[in-house]
Amino acid sequence: MIIPIDVKPPKRVEKAWGHELWIHNDEEYCGKLLVFEKEMANFSMHYHLKKKETWYIQQGSFQFNWIDVEDGLHDSRIIKEGDSVLIERGQPHQLISLQENSIVFEVSTQHFDEDSYRIYRGTPNDLL
């Protein structure tokens, strides 16, 4: 059986922190580029119940924040070009770009808009 090849541009989704380029999203997997256009751009601390994701830092660097689900404490680490990170289901996480035009290649299980649970907007420092 011959399966036709589908060539098309990615879907662009505008975000407050930049934009996403959706390469593919279906019941098997999702692939996206997350483009943080400005330094210190960030998405909210959030988690997913259905989605498991892996990030590859393609360009730039980020402060990667997460909440330890065992003790509720915040933790953070600088991640840079060439690093990869696995985000398990239910793991609260956040990225803050440290350079303009920082890019993450994300591969995950299927993306559902309703599967994003925000804990807070802004950065941990905004909570103080």
Locate the predicted segments by residue.
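Conserved short histidine dyad/triad with adjacent acidic residue
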Residues: 33-51
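Glycine- and acidic-residue-biased ligand/ion/polar-headgroup-sensing regions
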Residues: 49-69
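Short, surface-exposed beta-strand-loop junctions and turns on beta-sheet-rich folds
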Residues: 51, 70-72, 110-112
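Double-stranded beta-helix
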Residues: 94-128
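Short acidic-glycine-tyrosine-enriched beta hairpin
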Residues: 68-89
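Short beta-strand His + acidic residue motifs that chelate non-heme Fe in jelly-roll/DSBH
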Residues: 43-46, 64-66, 86-87, 93-98, ...
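A short, N-terminal "cap"/entry segment at the start of jelly-roll beta-barrel domains
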Residues: 1-33, 44, 77, 121-128
